[in-house]
UniProtKB/Swiss-Prot annotation:
Any one GO molecular function term: DNA binding
InterPro entries named among the record's database cross-references: Rep
Function: Produces a single-strand nick in a specific site of the plasmid, and this nick results in single-strand replication by rolling circle mechanism.
The name this protein goes by in its record: Protein rep
Keyword Coiled coil: no
Note, other: PC194 is a plasmid that specifies inducible chloramphenicol resistance.
Binding-site residues for DNA, renumbered to this chain: 214
Organism: Staphylococcus aureus
A GO BP annotation: DNA replication
Length: 229
């Protein structure tokens, strides 16, 4: 997995902004780690120096650090890709990518909304039709911030393993409208207008990165100091 120095520079610059946000929330020793985060990078390379791989770095490992979160997302995406390849080859399964969302909420409602999301998802997978098609899943919570409205949108990205026959067997296939109806039912929110569901195509890394990236985008939580963290 080659290292993207351009992306690293962008994330390191965001780390400078992050330091101002996090300072009042952590101790002096942890703050030193955040300030020095990824100032030392050691690489291994091939003979031509065209391919380089990060070997060692001084990471702060703070879950909100833009650099550390980006590196973890890349690592998780690779892990997901390897897992999917194994399950496809050994277990003969396919995958669908499901995104579940609800209307935005204000900051003081966010904690309760996340709890409600988790409860609703548990109800969803216990539904007979859903439970019969899911052979395994990976779920990630992502929270985005709308600067204009000053509100938040928590939503789930779910990678679901299904039998190959799922897409052709009408007894088990769940259409987008059915997913929407099920999600509306378990949340009790009829105002939900859409869910997104699609089959994962081979070698498509976009969905994997959506799954792997951190639950809050640094572009969102570094906007408003009074609302963040």
């Amino acid at each position: 997995m080659c290292y993207n120095m351009e992306k690293y520079t962008e994330k390191k610059q965001r780390n400078q902004v992050f330091q101002k946000f996090i300072k009042r929330h952590i101790g002096e020793n942890q703050m030193d780690l955040v300030e020095d985060c990824n100032t030392f990078l050691s690489f291994v390379a091939d003979k031509t120096l065209e391919k380089q791989k990060l070997y060692k770095a001084n990471s702060c490992k703070n879950r909100f650090c833009p650099v550390c979160a980006w590196r973890k997302a890349r690592k998780d995406a690779l892990g997901l890709s390897l897992m999917m390849q194994y399950i496809k080859q050994q277990e003969k399964k396919e995958f669908i990518f499901l995104t579940l969302t609800t209307p935005n909420v204000m900051s003081d409602e966010l904690e309760n909304e996340i709890k409600r999301y988790n409860n609703s998802f548990r109800k969803l997978i216990k539904r007979k039709k859903v439970g019969s098609v899911i052979k395994g899943y990976v779920r990630k919570l992502e929270i985005t911030y709308n600067k204009k409205r000053d509100d938040y949108n928590p939503h789930f990205h779910v990678l679901i393993a299904v039998n190959k026959s799922y897409f052709t067997d009408k007894r088990y296939y769940i259409s987008q409208q059915e997913w929407l109806d099920l999600w509306r039912d378990v949340t009790g929110i009829s105002e939900i207008t859409q869910v997104q569901v699609q089959k994962i195509r081979q070698n498509n890394n976009k969905e994997l990165y959506e799954m792997a990236k951190y639950s809050g985008k640094d572009s969102d939580y570094l906007i408003n100091k009074s609302k963040s963290l």
